[in-house]
A protein has these predicted regions:
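Intrinsically disordered, low-complexity acidic/Ser/Thr/Pro-rich linker and tail segments
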Residues: 1-68, 72-79, 273-274, 288-319
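WD40-repeat beta-propellers
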Residues: 11, 78-82, 103, 119-123, ...
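A structural motif specific to WD40 beta-propellers
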Residues: 46-49, 88-91, 128-131, 168-171, ...
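WD40/WD-repeat beta-propeller blade N-cap
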Residues: 52-59, 94-100, 134-140, 174-180, ...
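WD40/WD-repeat beta-propeller blade-loop signature
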Residues: 55-58, 89, 96-99, 129, ...
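Conserved beta-strand position repeated across blades of beta-propeller domains
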Residues: 61-63, 104, 144, 184, ...
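Conserved strand-to-loop turn within each blade of WD40 beta-propeller repeats
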Residues: 72-75, 113-116, 153-156, 177-181, ...
Length: 319
């Protein structure tokens, strides 16, 4: 069992109070934070880095690469941090008028979506707003990029594809009967998967808009999707506390981890040998299929966090 320590906290000076304790116990499968009422004594506090530029409300999403970390917040802004310069803020992105719910970026662009029903495309190098995409009629809950194409999904039941250079809506996928929480491109950009409050997962042909597969997937809102294009598998996580693995080609359920979390599953990701999930419990669970069956790592945190309009928050970065 591995224990993992928090090395750095970025935020306002008050982000860690004097009563906040961080406990780390070797050999025990927990890692958690506690309030002042607990009598345990922490071995050490993580380093706190505070800058004049910081978020004034909950951070709802983040992404990072080797150079920058970008965060989106309920304060309607994003902050870009320089990872190689002690995580100093480079700039703040301001244009949304409500909470930033998701973001994505590549070497040229940063794309953000918001409860204000819009998507913003920013120049990564300068922070300039290049264009604002409008077309959804509900909160835009998720965005992802593949080349010069953006996929978005919304509480308006729709998935949309956009050209990042022109801002034009290329295609629209209709069929879901309730609001959507997540959408994903396949690695080659040929397929799009979407899911949400109607408890189903749909797989679409990105070029034609045809719904290829519809899976009656879960007993509650499907909060998270992740496509592993190498294996052709799709991982879903739901408010029903289950994580499931699907065959993309056939729509067949391959694996089911019932009641994997004690509460809502907020995010589930995978690579060639692991599934990593976060929940409202609050836990991070790591299933390593390359190790012994009992080798499950669990990291526990503070109390459950609730995001806008009933959707709990969860970072999208995957370590």
């Amino acid at each position: 069992m591995h224990t993992m320590k928090c090395r750095l906290v970025i935020g306002p000076p008050s982000v860690i109070s004097s009563g906040t304790l961080l406990a780390d116990f070797d050999g025990v499968s927990v890692h958690y934070a506690m309030g002042a009422e607990n009598v345990r004594v922490a071995e050490a506090h993580p380093q706190l880095v505070s800058f004049p530029e910081h978020h004034m409300a909950s951070i709802l999403c983040l992404q990072y690469d080797d150079e920058i970390l970008v965060t989106g917040s309920s304060d309607s802004t994003c902050i870009v941090y320089d990872i190689n310069n002690s995580y100093r803020p480079i700039r703040r992105l301001r244009h949304h008028t409500a909470a930033v719910l998701d973001l994505a970026f590549d070497k040229k662009h940063i794309v953000t979506c918001s409860k204000d029903i819009s998507i913003c495309v920013w120049d990564r190098a300068t922070g300039a707003l290049l264009r604002q995409l409008r077309g959804h009629t509900g909160p835009v809950n998720a965005v992802q990029m593949r080349g010069n194409t953006i996929v978005s999904c919304s509480g308006d039941f729709k998935v949309k594809l956009w050209n990042i250079d022109t801002g034009k809506n290329i295609r629209e996928f209709e069929g879901h009967t309730k609001g959507l929480a997540c959408s994903q491109f396949s690695e080659d950009g040929r397929y799009v998967a979407s899911a949400g409050n109607d408890k189903t997962i749909r797989i679409w042909d990105a070029n034609t808009g045809e719904c290829i597969k519809e899976m009656r997937a879960h007993d509650n809102l499907v909060r998270s999707l992740h496509i592993d294009s190498v294996s052709g598998r799709l991982i879903s996580g739901s408010y029903d506390t289950d994580i499931k693995v699907w065959d993309m080609a056939t729509g067949r359920q391959m694996l089911d981890f019932p009641r994997w979390h004690a509460s809502w599953v907020l995010s589930a990701k995978s690579d060639y040998r692991r599934i990593v999930s976060t929940g409202q419990d609050p836990k991070i669970l790591i299933m390593d299929f390359g190790a012994d069956v009992e080798n499950i790592e669990m990291l526990e945190g503070g109390g459950p966090a609730s995001g806008p309009f009933g959707l709990p928050t969860s970072p999208k970065g995957f370590i």
